[in-house]
Structure formats: structure tokens, C-alpha cells
């Protein structure tokens, strides 16, 4: 690394130029000090003026001498080689204070992320090409003879089947109580009470979960007219965090062909919060971090992590 950087640079002249810059700064400082102090007390006005002018001229000569020396050394320093393998970005890693210059590591991370994104995009493109629709020109032109769209059967499940799925999930977890209601027609709404830890309002569309709101056990989950409140957030930051993680879990557990498995998997994940205030973080081993318990639960192992420790 040192040999690469030394190509084309006279290090001895470079060192002398640094000392010359320091000397030039000292000379300029003496000039301004002379102007600041003015004429010193002497026997007569004429003597004071001559002493002041003489001292001022000497200081200016020193500035001129140091400036000429700096110009001479600058011509001897030379220029660094332009054949550096990483060009200017390679110099970012030379600063030993990594906390002040994290740009180099961020560039490497962005490069790895870009390669991974390109790899996954290629896989997705191959899968989509296998499932591409083949339509002829005649089929595209005759819109009146098209077959009517068939609605997915999973969106039109009978209420009895949904009630049976929720009832079986309720029996699976004794510490979890699930209350089902249909205040707006066929769409079900669930009030899940997990021990004496928290309550969850779940809005469903058939067997698909649309929205979840997590609140504390002692918080009110009803509106003034007695209906479940599906809009207001919890007053506590810990349950707001759990609400965000539950929304992420809904995006993770996706299996449109088997919606009952999705609901059961989500409820199993939600049940892991029974020890929200008792389980330590599996990464740092602490119960609290920034005043909050471990609010994240791994989707596969259900282990507890702080939001910053799960990265």
C-alpha cells in the first residue's frame, strides 16, 4: 500500500513543505502582531517611527522568504500516480478514524447489495417468463368473447368454515382468547387477548388478515359506540413497536392457496409475546435497551431480540 502511494511523490520535499508552511504562518502572525502593537515607547517620535518601520520591513521580508521557499518546494513534491487501482475511492480507507469516515464500508455494502439484487432479479425474471401468458392477436381483439374472470375461491369462504378455523386455533393456545365478531357484514374481526400482556384487534377479509392493532392489556380497544377500534394506536411505545412487527409478520406469512395455515402461523408467532416482559434478548442478553424490552420475534425460531440487535 505504501509503495503504491509513494509513486510520483517526493516525501522528503513534502515533509520540508509542511515545515515551511508552519514557518510561513509564524511569519504572517508576527506581521499582524507588529501592526497590532504599533510603535513602542522610544525617546522621540522619529525614533519610534524608524523602529516600527524597520521591524515591519523585517517581518515582511521573512514572509516573502518563506513564501518563495514554499513555492520552490511545491515544485519538488510532484504529483501522485493516477494508476491507483481504486482511483480516489481507494484513499477513503486510509483514515484510521473509521467512525468519522464510514463511506468506504458503505460503498462495499452497497456493492454487495447491488450484486445480490441483480442475482435475485435474474431469478425472478426466469420464473416470470415461465408463467408468461400466451395470447394471440385474435384473442386480444375479440373482447366480447372473453371468458369472465373467475373470482378466487379463497375470498368467498363460507362464514361457518372461518368460524371453525378460528375455533380450532383458539383451542390450540390455552393462554390466548379469541373473540370473533362481524359488525360490518361477512368480514370478521377478532379480539385476541394474550394472557394479561396485550390485546390485538385483527381485521380480516375472509381468511386473509388485513390489519392488526396491538394495545396493552389495560387499554381500551372499543370506540364510544361499543365497536372495536381499528384505527387508534396504543399509548405505549412498546406496543406500537409490536404493531409494526405484526404488520411485517403479515407480509412474511403469505400463502394464498392455504389461508388457514397463514392465520395459524401468525397466531403462533403472536403467541410468542406471552413473555414480552420476561424474555431477554438472545443477542445482547439484556432485558431493556433504550427503555424497551425485546419487541422483535424471529419468524422461524420465535426468539426474542431488540429491534437494533436483530440486524
Curated annotation (Swiss-Prot):
Pfam families: Med27. The keyword Transcription regulation applies. It is found in: Nucleus. InterPro entries: Mediator_Med27. GO terms for molecular function: transcription coactivator activity. Keywords: Activator, Nucleus, Transcription, Transcription regulation. One of its GO terms (cellular component) is mediator complex. One of its GO terms (biological process) is regulation of transcription by RNA polymerase II. Belongs to the Mediator complex subunit 27 family. Component of the Mediator complex. Component of the Mediator complex, a coactivator involved in the regulated transcription of nearly all RNA polymerase II-dependent genes. Mediator functions as a bridge to convey information from gene-specific regulatory proteins to the basal RNA polymerase II transcription machinery. Mediator is recruited to promoters by direct interactions with regulatory proteins and serves as a scaffold for the assembly of a functional preinitiation complex with RNA polymerase II and the general transcription factors. This is Mediator of RNA polymerase II transcription subunit 27-A. It comes from Xenopus laevis.
